[in-house]
Amino acid sequence: MKFSLGTQEHGWVELTITDDIHRFEVIVSNVPNDFINDTMIALSQLLTYENKRQVWLSLEPAYYLMSIARQTDVFTITIDKGVSASNVVYYQASGDFKEVILPIYRSLKSFYNSRNEDLHWPAVNQMEFQNMLEAVALYKG
């Protein structure tokens, strides 16, 4: 699986998730929530004590819901519309830590390490960033 974040522009960033079969692409807003920061927190919690975390991908006013779940050493990422009548799944992939979590982690790390402070995206929460780095390092063992 590949998880990539494009260049942020005026509070919007392109999110692309691909694998050998599927492609999910959407431009996500940082209003009302910073989904990149929320994803960073979700990874930290998922690797330390949670079994499932959800992150809202805001399209103003619509949204997608990204769920990342863990069952033993199998991780699953799902993108859907949340609690809707249709329950349509727009993207889903499962795999081990290297196949699901590392692509997300590397993309988040790259996003924050390469940002320019002039761009219109909230600054990284250094404590949450450090928590994510430590959680991944501990899990990798």
What are these regions (language model features)?
Residues 1-8, 42-47:
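Short linear motifs in intrinsically disordered
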Residues 1-4, 14-30, 51, 59-70, ...:
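N-terminal intrinsically disordered, cationic/polar leader segments
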Residues 7-12, 139-140:
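N-terminal intrinsically disordered, low-complexity segments enriched in P/E/S/T
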Residues 19, 65-141:
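Long protein-protein interaction modules used by eukaryotic assembly/scaffold proteins
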Residues 22-54:
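Negatively charged, low-complexity tracts enriched in Asp/Glu with abundant Ser/Thr
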Residues 46-61, 113, 117-118:
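A short, charged
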